[in-house]
Design a protein with these regions (language model features):
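Nucleotide/pyrophosphate-binding catalytic subdomain
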Residues: 1-217
Length: 217
């Protein structure tokens, strides 16, 4: 919404941006201990400034390119994950935040980039092999191309990120938490008669993934 407002030369994007900023500040106030708020507020403020620079550019030229769009929408994941990371550190002292763009590498198909699995797996493996913290928090949905430009993985990109990371570090299990309890015979939001599937084979799951089933990658 905000980027489209800016590209249409609608100055209301500034109001929307301020609302976004205040919403994140309120989240910090409610979620993070007071002693840890100042540094985080500075971090989030700096991120918002970078976002504003991109939006100002869209406003000036009256255009929103796919590359700029990816850069803009990435802030949603970046802002929220950094807030969650600080809140998590209050419970797990050695938990850290890691920018997924440093590990997930893609082509330059902005909006729905394709992962370079060989390079990505190598980067993930090297990182986690030298990783000593008990918990690492990475934002989903975002990656970067060979030039360092921010890319996004398209619809379902956050779940896909989890699957890529699990594969790269050879995890023994991957849990994806959603607002639906397990897999259903249909989308329960659309089909009231949908029923949960008690068990499913890997082959059946693979077939479903080919037909666009969410969560499966």
């Amino acid at each position: 919404k905000t980027s489209n407002e800016a590209a249409l030369k609608n100055e209301s994007y500034l109001t929307t941006l301020e609302e976004i900023k205040q919403k994140h500040f309120e989240t910090i106030t409610n979620l993070v201990a007071k002693k840890n708020q100042n540094d985080l507020l500075v971090t989030i403020t700096n991120e918002i400034k970078q976002l504003k620079t991109l939006l100002d550019g869209c406003f000036l030229i009256g255009e929103l390119s796919p590359r700029t769009s990816d850069a803009i929408v990435s802030f949603g994941e970046l802002l929220s994950s950094q807030i969650i990371a600080v809140a998590l550190q209050e419970k797990v002292s050695d938990a850290i935040f890691k920018d997924s763009r440093e590990l997930l590498k893609t082509n330059s198909n902005f909006g729905k980039a394709t992962i370079n699995l060989k390079l990505t797996n190598s980067l993930i493996s090297n990182y986690f092999n030298s990783f000593k913290q008990s918990v690492v928090l990475l934002p989903g949905f975002i990656a970067s191309d060979e030039k360092g430009n921010t890319t996004t993985l398209g619809r379902g990109g956050s779940d896909f990120t989890a699957a890529i990371l699990a594969n790269g570090c050879k995890a023994t299990s991957l849990e994806i938490w959603t607002d639906v309890s397990g897999m259903f015979t249909a989308n329960p939001k659309l089909v009231k008669q949908a029923k949960p599937i008690e068990s499913i084979s890997y082959h059946e799951a693979m077939e479903l993934s080919h037909f666009g089933a969410k969560v499966l990658y």
